[in-house]
Each structure stands twice: as C-alpha cells, then as structure tokens.
C-alpha cells in the first residue's frame, strides 16, 4: 500500500479546475465521501505548480481495497452543496466522482 500514499494530479486537469487555489477535494464513490488534502509543489517548468492528492488518499485506497495496478478514473462534479450538474462553480468543496477498474479484471467500483 505504500506505493499509493500519493497520487499526482495531471497538470491539464488541475489547471482546468483551478487546483492552484484549492486546498482539498472530496472523492465520492459507492455512496461514500472522503476529503483529501492537496499538497502543492513547484514543478520543473516555470510557473507550473504540481498538485498531489495526499492526506486522506491513503484512507480512500484502504477503504476501497485498492492495490497497485488498479486504475482510478475521476470525473469533476459541481461543488458540494451547489446542486446537480457536472460543472464546478468554484464555491465550496470540489467534488470528484471516482470509478475504479481493478487490475484483476473484476467489476468496476463506482
């Protein structure tokens, strides 16, 4: 499980969703929610910060039985408490719906 303590957020995704200004995201899967803190580090390119899912990511992995080789798919949803839809309006917590495809070929976890 130690290999799964951090998860890098692709630069394109973090720029599209304003992660430079965010401190946390909420992951939703199987009717449950996990708050995960973002750690920001300077990237190798000038003015390109990197966001990493840190504190809370390990709990998400453990609670869902994730293993090395499993693939997580994230879909950005509207901020928590702002109604239905697929657009983040910048208010409140940024919510990501998660689907996991297990490396062993089992049914996806949603």
UniProtKB/Swiss-Prot annotation:
**Record-linked InterPro entries:** B3_DNA-bd (IPR003340), DNA-bd_pseudobarrel_sf (IPR015300), REM_fam (IPR039218)
Q: Transmembrane stretches, by residue range? A: none
Primary localisation category: nucleus
Q: Which GO terms describe its molecular function?
A: DNA binding
SUPFAM superfamilies this protein is in?
Answer: DNA-binding pseudobarrel domain
Where in or outside the cell is it found?
Answer: Nucleus
Asked whether the keyword Cell wall biogenesis/degradation is assigned, the reply is no
* Keyword terms of this UniProt record: DNA-binding, Nucleus, Transcription, Transcription regulation
User: What GO cellular component is one of the record's annotations?
Assistant: nucleus
Q: Which residues bind DNA?
A: 1-104
Report which superkingdom the organism of origin falls in. Answer: Eukaryota
> Would the keyword Flavoprotein be found if you checked this record's keyword annotation?
no
Q: Would you tell me the protein name for this molecule?
A: B3 domain-containing protein LOC_Os02g10420
Which organism is the protein's source? Oryza sativa subsp. japonica
């Amino acid at each position: 499980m130690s290999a799964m303590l951090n998860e890098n957020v692709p630069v394109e995704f973090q720029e599209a969703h304003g992660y430079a200004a965010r401190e946390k995201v909420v992951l939703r899967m199987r009717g449950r929610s996990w708050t995960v803190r973002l750690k920001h580090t300077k990237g190798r390119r000038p003015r390109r910060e990197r966001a990493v899912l840190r504190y809370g990511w390990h709990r998400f992995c453990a609670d869902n039985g994730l293993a090395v080789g499993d693939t997580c798919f994230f879909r950005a949803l509207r901020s928590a408490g702002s109604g239905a839809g697929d657009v983040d309006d910048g208010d409140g917590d940024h919510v990501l719906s998660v689907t996991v495809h297990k490396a062993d070929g089992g049914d996806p976890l949603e």
